[in-house]
C-alpha cells in the first residue's frame, strides 16, 4: 500500500553549473512542494500504513521546516559567498551537493528513510518529489539511493 504526504516550504538558492544564467549567478527563490510517498503494509489494528499525523511528526516536518525561508548553499561554492550569506541570513542550509531539485530529492529520500527506520515499522520511502515550480519537479526513487 502506498500513502503520500505533501509538505511545503519557501527557500532561495543558486544552482551553480546550471545552463540558465539566472539560476547560475543569481540568488532566487522557489515555493517548494515536497511529496513523500511511503510504502508499507496496512496495520490491521489501525487500518493504516501510518497515521498522517505520525508521518508529519516522526521528524519529516522538522527536517523540511529547517529549509523554510532559508538560503540553501552548496558546500563547494565560493567561500566568500558562503560567508556573506551566513553573515546576513539567520536561516542557512549547507548541502553536500549542488542544491538542485534532483539532489534535494535524493538527500530528502535518504534522510526520511533514516527517520522511518528508527520507528521499526518496516515502512519504506517509495519516492520523493521536489517541486521547484508548478510545472517542474525531480523525483527520487528507491534505486536512486
Task: Please annotate each region the language model reported.
Residues 1-145:
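Charge-rich, low-complexity N-terminal segments
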Amino acid at each position: 500500500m502506498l500513502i503520500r504526504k505533501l509538505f511545503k516550504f519557501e527557500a532561495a538558492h543558486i544552482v551553480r553549473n546550471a545552463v540558465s544564467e539566472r539560476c547560475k549567478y543569481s540568488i532566487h527563490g522557489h515555493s517548494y512542494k515536497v511529496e513523500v510517498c511511503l510504502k508499507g503494509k496496512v496495520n490491521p489494528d489501525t487500518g493504516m500504513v501510518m497515521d498522517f499525523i505520525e508521518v508529519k511528526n516522526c521528524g519529516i516536518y522538522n527536517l523540511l521546516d529547517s529549509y523554510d525561508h532559508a538560503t540553501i548553499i552548496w558546500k563547494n561554492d565560493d567561500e566568500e559567498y558562503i560567508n556573506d550569506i551566513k553573515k546576513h541570513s539567520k536561516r542557512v542550509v549547507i548541502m553536500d551537493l549542488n542544491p538542485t531539485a534532483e539532489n534535494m530529492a535524493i538527500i530528502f529520500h535518504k534522510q526520511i528513510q533514516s527517520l522511518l527506520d528508527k520507528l521499526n515499522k518496516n515502512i519504506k520511502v517509495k519516492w520523493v518529489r521536489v517541486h521547484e515550480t508548478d510545472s517542474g519537479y525531480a523525483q527520487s526513487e528507491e534505486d536512486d539511493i
